[in-house]
Amino acid sequence: MATPSMMPQWSYMHISGQDASEYLSPGLVQFSQATETYFNLNNKFRNPTVAPTHDVTTERSQRLQLRFVPVDKEDTQYTYKTRFQLAVGDNRVLDMASTFFDIRGTLDRGPSFKPYSGTAYNIMAPKSAPNNCQYLDPKGETEAGKVNTIAQASFVGPIDETTGDIKITEEEDEETTIDPLYEPQPQLGPSSWSDNIPSATSGAGRVLKQTTPRQPCYGSYASPTNIHGGQTKDDKVTPLYFTNNPATEAEALEENGLKPNVTLYSEDVDLKAPDTHLVYAVNQTQEFAQYGLGQQAAPNRANYIGFRDNFIGLLYYNSNGNQGMLAGQASQLNAVVDLQDRNHRTSYQLFLDSLYDRSRYFSLWNQAIDSYDKDVRVLENNGVEDEMPNFCFPIGAIETNMTFTQLKKSENGGSRATTWTKENGDDGGNGAEHYLGIGNLNAMEINLTANLWRSFLYSNVALYLPDKYKFSPPNVPIDPNTHSYDYINKRLPLNNLIDTFVNIGARWSPDVMDNVNPFNHHRNYGLRYRSQLLGNGRYCKFHIQVPQKFFALKSLLLLPGATYTYEWSFRKDVNMILQSTLGNDLRADGAKINIESVNLYASFFPMAHNTASTLEAMLRNDTNNQTFIDFLSSANMLYPIPANVTNLPISIPSRNWAAFRGWSFTRLKHNETPALGSPFDPYFTYSGSIPYLDGTFYLGHTFRRISIQFDSSVAWPGNDRLLTPNEFEVKRTVDGEGYTVAQTNMTKDWFLVQMLAHYNIGYQGYHLPEGYRDRTYSFLRNFEPMCRQVPDYANHKDEYLEVPTTNQFNSSGFVSAAFTAGMREGHPYPANWPYPLIGEDAVQTVTQRKFLCDRTLWRIPFSSNFMSMGTLTDLGQNLLYANSAHALDMTFEVDAMDEPTLLYVLFEVFDVCGVHQPHRGVIEAVYLRTPFSAGNATT
């Protein structure tokens, strides 16, 4: 087999296309064209699901897919390892491209799993309304007479004067004895507002004893303890009797004794809050007193948990040792050699995007790409359409709390004086009833559209603010582990950072949110879909089909007449294989996975004997090696950027740059990037999207400038661009020359480079890319320009004051001053923020511009003739770089971030794997990655 040094230079870039016909050898392409009725080689994906229509020799050859059971398996703490024996019979060709693992097991997504927003329990209750309950006096004393009650006796009916129990009437109008273990039921009451005319004088209900902990009605749950729905936990229900008439014992004696007109059945229940928590709480000494009645609940934050897109992270690819094996019968040497930086996970994401629309979801391979709502990432604060006031009225509309007596008019004899007397029937206590209201109908106004918009901003933006803009509510116990769900869930955002008046009228992403991972959000529809595939319960069984994405083997055909050993390891680290909305540490929060079985499904091409023999002979020929190229075809490197650092120099030692195509790069957060060399990274306490693996890049906007300098005197890429050679300016804050573009701070130069690199559009005239090029990860689709005006504080220091958010007030008296979702406080008063930017009172402003470009890898193509790169191959490269060794120095200037990050650089090199099978049971593989590394393996 040819060694790397023997491969001719001229052939490097002529097999760089992604279509199979471009990188298979000519002989094999000719063969595939002659046998199109058997299988299709387009785009690396074969379709072996339809049997051929002729030349099929045996029944066995029509079995297109076989299940292989592992001959050996090893279940350890961190991995599950399986080994298979692949027997490829005569007249059969095994297609490793379409193999997949069929995995069954059980999954505990942990107590942090919450697949919905809001609460499932008493969602209609006000957030701080108490349940019917008893409470202690403010001093917390419990002696007789010191236990107070607050309750609604909704079950209206007469009270038995002898027993004190409420009388319940059955359908036959017969009164029955109640069962206090569940009667009266709390959901029953008058069916209509008119049932309360006249006002009910007696009734009953249930009430929680003072020994049951305080909890707002919103989110309250107590499990039933009997089939009737009763909830008392010890079968001890104590009736309590109350009266409100007469008031004193002396009056009672005149009325023949005191009589109850309200009976409450008190009980202790197992009160819980499964999906809510307190955001306003009193200290423990006041919890059982009246102060505990006003505690406020909020729903736990939604946290979808499912397998990652395309099961990223489940198959363990070690970059330092061989965790996978493909060995032939004749030798046990491993054909899966050390491919330290093949990027195959990110490559696979971009590869699939080039094949079909990733906005379509497929359950079979868990293909539901991570996404975010653009209306959340880039806020268009258009205000609210609230020209019409919104009123709410009493259910009966007319007030019924004022009772009137009907009069009649009569004239008095000769004096004709008018007198008034009661109408007949209205005299005494048995007269007619008249409930009359005076004036307009009583109503209350609520600004529905403003509340909906404010609620959207709070739930979708404010709750996702960085932790430094949040506080821990007093008296609420919080886990000190900042990566835990309890901590993330209970922290509250500071007021006025995100509200209806912030950036009103602008299309602008809040600056504090730009560096927050937008894919870690409950509006990540791909993650939500993958979570829902597993069901809506914490504990679930899973049965998944996981494709093998290892690019060295992706399109490999195993030839007939041999047995191969094939083994792989599967991770069991829940932070790596599962993805959560909030990115909390699933290990610490109790998630667990148990793999019960792994089978391998492999597809064969059934062929007639002559056809199979011909294919085998051709593939065994030295000139017909199977040649496979990684989609990104790059060597990746990670460079740490410490917190608050803005300059990062990189040096690459001297080497030959033949076949080099350029650079792709972006920025990653350190805590979102695992160490891939270990099956279990103890420092990876995060479970959100992993940009390093799944392509959810979002920090591209933090680059300012890149300089690239070879150690030669030749200026690269020439002085035919706007700026100086060897330097690329991404954005500029001050633009005196007008070098920025598209109402942003991106330079025209950088815009030109990206259009060249992504679409091969080499001029700045009006031109749009072809549709097939503008896919999910492309430049223009993700380019988000933004612009806004802010008061000119610098030049008007005496007039315009930068009031801190804690001293800003807007809608005072109608909203909370403590945090956005709190109870309203204060009184109506003119707002002091923001400064008006419109109308006759508009202040002097300055214009701010910026952009976001998520998902996209910035690219700088490498060519000596930069403006005439053609199809971006190496054909135009200067011979100085192509045939001589040079050292490379790069300097990246970036925005400072207050946490450690990583510079992710892809050196677009020639990355190829050649596979040869000269004899049955023997596989030879050569791996070439110039200019960075080469290797080979023979089995």
Curated annotation (Swiss-Prot):
Site (Involved in interaction with pre-protein VI) location in chain: G762
Single Gene Ontology BP annotation: microtubule-dependent intracellular transport of viral material towards nucleus
Expression triggers: Expressed in the late phase of the viral replicative cycle.
GO molecular function: structural molecule activity
UniProt KW keywords: Acetylation, Capsid protein, Cytoplasmic inwards viral transport, Host nucleus, Host-virus interaction, Late protein, Microtubular inwards viral transport, Phosphoprotein, T=25 icosahedral capsid protein, Virion, Virus entry into host cell
Signal peptide residues on this chain, from the entry's feature table: none
Modified residues (Phosphotyrosine): Y927
Alphabetized Pfam families for the sequence: Adeno_hexon (PF01065), Adeno_hexon_C (PF03678)
Coiled-coil intervals: none
Gene Ontology CC terms, in alphabetical order: host cell; host cell nucleus; T=25 icosahedral viral capsid
Localization, UniProt: Virion; Host nucleus
Modification sites for N-acetylalanine: A2
Source species, domain of life: Viruses
InterPro entries in UniProt: Adenovirus_Pll_hexon_C (IPR016108), Adenovirus_Pll_hexon_N (IPR016107), Adenovirus_Pll_hexon_sub2 (IPR044942), Adenovirus_Pll_hexon_sub3 (IPR016110), ADV_hexon (IPR037542), VP_dsDNA_II (IPR016112)
Extra information: All late proteins expressed from the major late promoter are produced by alternative splicing and alternative polyadenylation of the same gene giving rise to non-overlapping ORFs. A leader sequence is present in the N-terminus of all these mRNAs and is recognized by the viral shutoff protein to provide expression although conventional translation via ribosome scanning from the cap has been shut off in the host cell.
Main function: Major capsid protein that self-associates to form 240 hexon trimers, each in the shape of a hexagon, building most of the pseudo T=25 capsid. Assembled into trimeric units with the help of the chaperone shutoff protein. Transported by pre-protein VI to the nucleus where it associates with other structural proteins to form an empty capsid. Might be involved, through its interaction with host dyneins, in the intracellular microtubule-dependent transport of incoming viral capsid to the nucleus.
Family named by the database record: Belongs to the adenoviridae hexon protein family.
Complex and partners: Homotrimer. Interacts with the capsid vertex protein; this interaction binds the peripentonal hexons to the neighboring penton base. Interacts with the hexon-linking protein; this interaction tethers the hexons surrounding the penton to those situated in the central plate of the facet. Interacts with the hexon-interlacing protein; this interaction lashes the hexons together. Interacts with host dyneins DYNC1LI1 and DYNC1I2; this interaction might be involved in intracellular microtubule-dependent transport of incoming viral capsid.
Protein name in UniProt: Hexon protein
Underlying gene: L3
